[in-house]
Amino acid sequence: MTASSVLLHTGQKMPLIGLGTWKSEPGQVKAAIKHALSAGYRHIDCASVYGNETEIGEALKESVGSGKAVPREELFVTSKLWNTKHHPEDVEPALRKTLADLQLEYLDLYLMHWPYAFERGDNPFPKNADGTVRYDSTHYKETWKALEVLVAKGLVKALGLSNFNSRQIDDVLSVASVRPAVLQVECHPYLAQNELIAHCHARGLEVTAYSPLGSSDRAWRHPDEPVLLEEPVVLALAEKHGRSPAQILLRWQVQRKVICIPKSINPSRILQNIQVFDFTFSPEEMKQLDALNKNWRYIVPMITVDGKRVPRDAGHPLYPFNDPY
């Protein structure tokens, strides 16, 4: 039986399986949170840009707190600072909006969602006439210093990064008085992220995998892309262990001590996704899954510019995915 959480350098325990809420529609996410809490989840991953924190807050208000089903101190809640709120003056108001929406007094973890800043304001995707994004020059190191104030004020217990590469992580560490505790990135057997995970672990950061099942429900999905849940190695292990393909993918991660936040609104899949602590893979089975790595990235935000689909931010100097890791 594997431990079901990792210890952050802050002393907090972070559950290895959490419920992801990206692409969970309002009208569905409240029920999903309640199903997850009753299935034993104690980790919820949110973000202001997902547009559903108000409804998540309704579920938390009904289920979490003194005299409710789940004591607040048993729940680990993550949210993320969006790109339009990187200016130091905008950081605390953005967090306070998230806290108000989630109906919480503090967050367990607050992540910078991306390394680059968009133009300030309340439109999450400010665009030029040709469809390209309008950026802001605020550097993530300035944003980080503003995030540190939130810890001092007791509004956030730990800070972290999302979609940063190894060089950018070290850049943040060079100015940090509050060290990042977690890096959240896309990660699954097709994008194993071994170098990046080793880099993080050597510096005291834990790693959370988003889209651990391969994210086949994205709007910009390519018809020819590989489908992770149909990978023959995964299907063979699922049959051998009497498990679902999703459980195979999640077990591989938790056995590597990588946190996962699979998104689901389906009660039976929500339950299935946390039932990964009562079986283990042999070293040979882990090697079979490790061998699937092809550095295949599903999550590259796309936009339409002059009628063509192009990566949204690939030309930005702080775009994280041009480096090897």
From Swiss-Prot:
Catalytic residues as annotated in Swiss-Prot or TrEMBL: Y50
Tissue specificity: Widely expressed.
Disruption phenotype: Deficient mice develop and grow normally but suffer severe osteopenia and spontaneous fractures with stresses that increase ascorbic acid requirements, such as pregnancy or castration. Deficient mice exhibit reduced asorbic acid and D,L-glyceraldehyde levels. The activities of glucuronate reductase and glucuronolactone reductase, which are involved in ascorbic acid biosynthesis, are suppressed in AKR1A knockout mice. Strongly decreased reduction of S-nitroso-coenzyme A (S-nitroso-CoA), leading to increased S-nitrosylation of proteins. Mice are protected against acute kidney injury.
N6-acetyllysine modifications at: K127
Pfam families per record: Aldo_ket_red
Catalysis performed (reactions): a primary alcohol + NADP(+) = an aldehyde + NADPH + H(+); L-gulonate + NADP(+) = aldehydo-D-glucuronate + NADPH + H(+); L-gulono-1,4-lactone + NADP(+) = D-glucurono-3,6-lactone + NADPH + H(+); allyl alcohol + NADP(+) = acrolein + NADPH + H(+)
Residues engaged in binding NADP(+): 11-22, 45, 162-163, 211, 213, 215-216, 263-265, 269, 272-273
CDD domains reported for this sequence: AKR_AKR1A1-4 (cd19106)
Residues found modified as Phosphoserine: S4, S38, S211
BP term (GO), one: doxorubicin metabolic process
Keywords: Acetylation, Cell membrane, Cytoplasm, Lipid metabolism, Membrane, NADP, Oxidoreductase, Phosphoprotein
Subcellular locations according to the entry: Cytoplasm, Cytosol; Apical cell membrane
Modified residues (N6-succinyllysine): K127, K145
Acetylation keyword on record: yes
Record-linked InterPro entries: AKR, AKR1A, Aldo/ket_reductase_CS, NADP_OxRdtase_dom, NADP_OxRdtase_dom_sf
MF terms in GO: alcohol dehydrogenase (NADP+) activity; aldose reductase (NADPH) activity; allyl-alcohol dehydrogenase activity; glucuronolactone reductase activity; glycerol dehydrogenase (NADP+) activity; L-glucuronate reductase activity; methylglyoxal reductase (NADPH) (acetol producing) activity; S-nitrosoglutathione reductase (NADH) activity
Site (Lowers pKa of active site Tyr) location in chain: K80
Family: Belongs to the aldo/keto reductase family.
Function: Catalyzes the NADPH-dependent reduction of a wide variety of carbonyl-containing compounds to their corresponding alcohols. Displays enzymatic activity towards endogenous metabolites such as aromatic and aliphatic aldehydes, ketones, monosaccharides and bile acids, with a preference for negatively charged substrates, such as glucuronate and succinic semialdehyde. Plays an important role in ascorbic acid biosynthesis by catalyzing the reduction of D-glucuronic acid and D-glucurono-gamma-lactone. Functions as a detoxifiying enzyme by reducing a range of toxic aldehydes.
Assembly description: Monomer.
Name of the molecule in the record: Aldo-keto reductase family 1 member A1
Source organism (scientific name): Mus musculus
Chain's gene name: Akr1a1
